[in-house]
Amino acid sequence: MDANKQKALELAMKQIDKQFGKGSLVKLSDKDIEPIAAIPTGSFGLDLALGIGGIPKGRITEIYGPESSGKTTLALSIIAQAQKDGGVAAFIDAEHALDVIYAKHIGVDVDNLLVSQPDYGEQALEIVETLARSGAVDIIVIDSVAALTPKAEIEGNMGDAQVGVQARLMSQALRKLTAAIHKMNTTVVFINQIRMKIGMMGYGSPETTTGGNALKFYSSVRLDVRRIATLKQADKEVGNRVKVKVVKNKVAPPFRIAEFDIMFGKGISREGELLDYGVKLDIIDKSGAWFSYGATRLGQGKENAKEYLKSHPELAQEIEQKIKDALGVELSHMIEAIEKDEDELNLKGE
């Protein structure tokens, strides 16, 4: 840069610092760039799919899917993981449907969980903003966007047309929230529902999420949660097999998929993931219906093997460490492959 431009830039930076405060504009070389911190999800398969070990701190995450697919369970699992690391969590129960006993079974410290059941959407989002600006709360979960009913709609008559009111409310709230949560490093998770597009014909998905497009744009991560199978034990339904697709990811490559079991009354099955990844990585041997780890027979059938691992935590921990080591090697190979592809593209571009 020539001397005149350098001088003009320095003057502009001084003026900006004077007007907006020191550090309003800095060179990246003068600033320490730290890796993106994350809150684990409770599923190490999903943590791997997210690329950074969980959902990013200080950002917005959207979890959406059909009813009874496991959205709230996943969100509560994230809260439990944040609390384990000493974090403060808040749950904005716009649906007025929080099951405290289930949350406790999942691992949530319900005694220290902040809960609000707002009367209307504006109140809910004001509470979220106040908590975020306080800097004292690490994670806020809003359940759900569809239940954030604008005050005008509540006070109006049944059948009154309220076109786009909720979308405008969300757009305004997210504009205000984004800067606050980034500055205070507060993680905000919105749970959302699916609706069918009216008059949808031809190509594209007929599904959409509620609350307009603003949340899609402001979210750093979007997770599509689907129930793909019902788990049974002796003809009794005991849980669901769930598939989560990382539809959007601003902090790592998107479109990765994770599958795990959600057990009724218990939440995400850690033992189920140990068996799935253990078999996939040849750490656990599966012969017919039998699961074995070295000379140790874990059980006949997945549910029995899961129970064995649950009653032998030291063995489960040993298997988990081997899986993480194997996945770490696999991930490093993936990163090397991506970097190699990028180098080749750069060479072609030159």
Swiss-Prot record:
It is found in: Cytoplasm. Can catalyze the hydrolysis of ATP in the presence of single-stranded DNA, the ATP-dependent uptake of single-stranded DNA by duplex DNA, and the ATP-dependent hybridization of homologous single-stranded DNAs. It interacts with LexA causing its activation and leading to its autocatalytic cleavage. NCBIfam families: tigrfam_recA. One of its GO terms (molecular function) is single-stranded DNA binding. HAMAP family: RecA. Gene3D superfamilies: P-loop containing nucleotide triphosphate hydrolases. GO terms for biological process: DNA recombination; DNA repair; SOS response. It comes from Nautilia profundicola (strain ATCC BAA-1463 / DSM 18972 / AmH). The gene is recA. InterPro entries: AAA+_ATPase, DNA_recomb/repair_RecA, DNA_recomb/repair_RecA_CS, P-loop_NTPase, RecA-like_C, RecA-like_N, RecA_ATP-bd, RecA_C_sf. Keywords: ATP-binding, Cytoplasm, DNA damage, DNA recombination, DNA repair, DNA-binding, Nucleotide-binding, SOS response. This is Protein RecA. One of its GO terms (cellular component) is cytosol.
